[in-house]
């Protein structure tokens, strides 16, 4: 109940007390006690809602505040039954015996964007980075160069060069080399010449199998001689 009483006292202080005074006449409140409590708050605490200042206010302030709130029925369903109860709550709040908090103590800088990154955003970013890395690796590994052909009345020159080599080894060796050169030029029409050459060389060796076959042939030749 003291928790609800604490908020009831807050409603009677500072700006809320001014609103209470404004509707005092319409609600049949005790106008004089509301006015006196408000004046004490302005003169002693400069209108600020400071628990330390409120705790040290004279007893007359709490009496007027209690009478004002009681006549306006603002202390219903609370355990405030006397002016001393109001003072006690203010003083407990001043000594931090009652839990209080300030919005200013919450810093938005403590929260980072990565904490809220959705799974979709994280997956998309990862896929993008993976595709970029894969594309760079593929281009470097295959050595493929895209070229464009040009032709027409005002074309002057066009050339294309492509070379590559592949080496495969599996119980042997295979090497393939290819070169291609294309050149062309035109002034009023289109002409082109191309020269390509390809050579492939494949060498396979099976040391173990060849040696065994050679021994078998020698044995067969000896048998025929006998």
Curated annotation (Swiss-Prot):
**At which residues does the record annotate a lipid attachment of kind GPI-anchor amidated serine?**
197
- Propeptide positions: 198-226
Q: What Gene Ontology biological process does one annotation of this record name?
A: cell adhesion
| Function, as annotated | Putative adhesin which is involved in cell adhesion and virulence. Plays a role in Candida-bacterial interactions and subsequent regulation of filamentation.
Modification(s) after translation: Predicted to be a cleavage substrate for KEX2.
**Cell compartments where the protein resides:** Cell membrane
Q: Does the keyword Signal apply?
A: yes
Membrane topology, as annotated, equals: Lipid-anchor; GPI-anchor
Q: Which organism is it from?
A: Candida albicans (strain SC5314 / ATCC MYA-2876)
- Specify the domain of life of the species encoding this protein: Eukaryota
Compositional bias (Low complexity) spans?
A: 131-148, 161-208
Say if the entry is tagged with keyword Cytoplasm: no
Q: Where is the signal peptide?
A: 1-26
Which keywords describe this protein according to UniProt? Cell adhesion, Cell membrane, Glycoprotein, GPI-anchor, Lipoprotein, Membrane, Signal, Virulence
What switches on its expression? Up-regulated upon milbemycins A3 oxim derivative (A3Ox) treatment.
One cellular component (GO) term of this entry: plasma membrane
Q: Where is this region: Disordered?
A: 119-209
The protein depicted here goes by the name Probable GPI-anchored adhesin-like protein PGA28
Q: Where is the composition biased (Polar residues)?
A: 149-160
């Amino acid at each position: 109940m003291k928790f609800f009483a604490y908020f009831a006292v807050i409603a009677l202080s500072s700006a809320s007390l001014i609103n209470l005074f404004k509707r005092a006449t319409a609600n049949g409140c005790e106008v004089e006690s509301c006015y006196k409590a408000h004046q004490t708050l302005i003169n002693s605490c400069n209108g600020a809602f400071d628990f330390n200042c409120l705790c040290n206010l004279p007893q007359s302030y709490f009496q007027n505040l209690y009478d004002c709130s009681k006549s306006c029925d603002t202390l219903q369903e609370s355990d405030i039954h006397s002016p001393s109860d109001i003072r006690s709550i203010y003083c407990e709040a001043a000594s931090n015996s009652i839990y209080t908090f300030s919005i200013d103590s919450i810093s938005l800088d403590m929260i980072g964007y990565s904490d809220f990154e959705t799974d979709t955003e994280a997956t998309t970013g990862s896929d993008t980075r993976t595709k970029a890395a894969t594309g760079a690796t593929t281009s470097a590994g295959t050595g493929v160069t895209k070229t464009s052909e040009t032709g027409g009345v005002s074309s002057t020159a066009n050339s294309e060069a492509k070379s590559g080599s592949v080496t495969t080894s599996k119980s042997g060796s295979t090497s393939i080399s290819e070169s291609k050169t294309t050149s062309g030029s035109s002034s009023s029409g289109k002409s082109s010449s191309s020269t390509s050459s390809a050579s492939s060389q494949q060498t396979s060796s099976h040391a173990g199998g060849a040696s065994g076959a050679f021994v078998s042939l020698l044995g067969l030749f000896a048998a025929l001689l006998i």
